[in-house]
């Protein structure tokens, strides 16, 4: 595959167009962090408000990834991604025109929807590439797309400075953010007109039922319910944070009302899950062994994504301000240094997928990388102003490599679970990455950077233990074609994790 990577024909063209779509959504999603201190000074924001905006940036991505996953499985990645790209201009312009904290909160909440675009490409890539090369294909998609976070950290400050003549010599952050949204919307139109959901002659397989994931055992149903509650909890945590005295975006009664709405959302979500799985729960339907999958394995992948992508979200959001305050740097310089973290996505996430393809065990690849995440963040815990800046950068890049390689390893497994429900499963796993980001950034907003780093390190080591003892090796994960598919033509269901 690597030899033909830059041929830009057939499936490789689709891969490149799709990772670039993801790249643009990430540039949009992270366009606030490089300007956090500048915006804070201009709009007179307190440090706690800036931290809260970082949490808001992640919040709606949690339900959005679930919804996008269902829409994706029903309508296909071409339509879903195109609409999402065109929508990106709305929160970008809202941020660029914001005049106070409340307007920024609304714009960053909407921007979280754009951050759900990652899920779409997972299904697109899974349709065009074989299981034996799924790791590297998903790694390139995820890694090169995630490079958009670097594009935001590094390029946007330069763009803002280069257009400063429009704002009387001051850094023109508003124009930089607006331009990114406009470019992304234009690319959405291009994407719609130039890609296809599947190779010619291949059937795009859709779930038989919509509204919730169809599981194959009662045990998996209850595991899914617990998983769904965790995501609602993350949104409730955000509402609590927005009610705190130093933030006070919500009143106490508004917070309780938000919790009530979230409880209603969970009840509705549970009803839809029961409706989709009613025949299973009432004993009217049983699934043959070949069609079963364990939702517990999905839950483990959700945990891995908390520790790798969740920590990456937190790090990318707080590192510019961390370097600026710890070492007394100018915000542009601090942003460029912090950009070394997302910069590594270009190679680290693909390498995680490639190692998973070549190592011979996706389970042990995931376990070893999780250990690396834990150790590297525990090292970052000790960074302070007495450290040489190059050493601090090196430790940051060490943490970045393992966190991003872990993302590649996670999504080398996700498409192997149940092919026709890849969107929903990828949405669940991806949403838990945002869950991790919200929890980690909430911890950061209440404590400090060393506490955040140690928390992320300990969580990753616990995850490594869970993977070593409970994660199962996906069946058929090194096969030349999906189970039941003859080369490019889909005929039967593709299920790779069987329930015992």
Swiss-Prot record:
By sequence similarity, the record places it as follows: Belongs to the major facilitator superfamily. Nitrate/nitrite porter (TC 2.A.1.8) family.
The gene name reads nrtP
Keyword field: Cell inner membrane, Cell membrane, Membrane, Nitrate assimilation, Transmembrane, Transmembrane helix, Transport
Spell out the InterPro entries in the cross-references: MFS, MFS_dom, MFS_trans_sf, NO3_transporter, NO3_transporter_NarK/NarU-like
The record's NCBIfam families line, in alphabetical order, gives:
2A0108
Q: How is the protein disposed in the membrane?
A: Multi-pass membrane protein
A Gene Ontology biological process in which this protein takes part is:
nitrite transport
One of the record's GO cellular component terms? plasma membrane
Expression induction: Expression is repressed by ammonium.
Q: Which GO terms describe its molecular function?
A: nitrate transmembrane transporter activity; nitrite transmembrane transporter activity
Which segments cross the bilayer? Answer: 19-39, 52-72, 79-99, 109-129, 147-167, 175-195, 220-240, 247-267, 364-384, 389-409, 425-445, 451-471
Free-text function comment from the UniProt entry? Transport system for both nitrate and nitrite, with much higher affinity for nitrate than for nitrite.
What is its subcellular localisation?
A: Cell inner membrane
Q: Keyword Hydrolase: yes or no?
A: no
Q: PROSITE patterns under this entry?
A: MFS (PS50850)
What Gene3D superfamilies does its record include?
Answer: MFS general substrate transporter like domains (1.20.1250.20)
The name this protein carries in UniProt is: Nitrate/nitrite transporter NrtP
